[in-house]
Regions:
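Cytoplasmic-side transmembrane-helix entry/capping segments in multi-pass membrane proteins
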Residues: 137-147
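Helix-coil boundary and interhelical linker segments in multi-pass alpha-helical membrane proteins
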Residues: 27-49, 103-117, 152-170, 225-228
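Topogenic membrane-insertion module of multi-pass membrane proteins
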Residues: 1-67, 71, 84-97
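Multi-pass membrane catalytic core of lipid/isoprenoid biosynthesis enzymes
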Residues: 67, 72-117, 165-176, 211-217, ...
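Generic alpha-helical transmembrane segments of integral inner-membrane proteins
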Residues: 19-23, 45-56, 93-104, 108, ...
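C-terminal membrane-associated helical module and adjoining short loops/tails
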Residues: 1-7, 13-14, 131, 149-228
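Acidic (Asp/Glu-rich) catalytic motifs at the cytosolic membrane interface
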Residues: 54-80, 139, 180-188
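Structural signal for the C-terminal ends of transmembrane alpha-helices
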Residues: 27-32, 128-132, 181
Length: 228
């Protein structure tokens, strides 16, 4: 196993998405009207690291499932598994090890199993996403958005704070906005070649996604006005 290829397959540049886990610290400070405790900060940081490992295991799974289609993609064909830099057996072994490591960190973040339970739900959702749901238009975007909500929930459980329904709605609208813009970028990049890749992308068009993005922008603005 090439260490550099394996590291690239983990997609550490995508770990920035897991900062949603740390949002719970801001909610904790706002709820209590004071700085969050050291214990809450350490637990939330462990939850953040747990999500980094678990999300990397999910990326490995997705790349294993899509390896043949990725080889036809102008950009994804350079990924370690699709390019052959990382063998399929090595990727499978790495996926298991990284996933177990993520669950262990999740348990350490909240010994009662609260964070680990969220990680299991996140992994289960992405298992369904990799094999089926990503091929269903709009459902694929909602799956991505739900993944961000799981991050927020894990952070809340680690920090010992309950996230409000309004905060979840705000996060959902923001996550959907990001997911739809990602789909828009993919459609623009692939152009006519979209038919050779993911099935759901064939159902998206620039005009259709722009309409959805506009709706999400309206939802975000309404939420901001409501909370003024």
């Amino acid at each position: 196993m090439s260490p550099s290829a394996f590291l690239r397959a983990l997609r550490p540049h995508q770990w920035t998405k897991n900062v949603f886990v740390l949002a719970a610290l801001a909610f904790a400070a706002g709820e209590k009207g004071e700085a969050f405790s050291t214990e809450a900060a350490v637990a939330t940081l462990l939850a953040f690291l747990a999500f980094c490992l678990t999300s990397s295991a999910v990326y490995l799974l997705n790349d294993l499932v899509d390896v043949e289609k990725d080889r036809l993609h102008p950009k994804k064909k350079h990924r370690p598994i699709a390019s052959g830099a990382l063998s399929i057996p090595a990727a499978r072994l790495g996926m298991v090890l990284v996933g177990v490591g993520g669950l262990a960190l999740g348990w350490a973040a909240a010994p009662g199993g609260g964070v680990a339970g969220v990680l299991v739900l996140y992994a289960t959702l992405n298992l369904a996403y990799s094999f089926r749901l990503k091929h269903v238009v709009l459902v694929d975007a909602f799956c991505i958005a739900t993944g961000f909500l799981f991050r927020v929930e894990a952070g809340g459980r680690a920090a010992g704070v309950e996230i409000s329904h309004w905060a979840y709605l705000c996060m959902l609208f923001l996550a959907l906005f990001l997911a739809l813009n990602k789909r828009r970028a993919e459609v623009m990049q692939l152009g006519e070649g979209v038919a050779t890749t993911r099935q759901s992308l064939r159902e998206y068009s620039i005009a259709f996604v722009d309409q959805l993005v506009g709706v999400e922008q309206g939802h975000i603005m309404e939420y901001q006005n409501f909370n003024k």
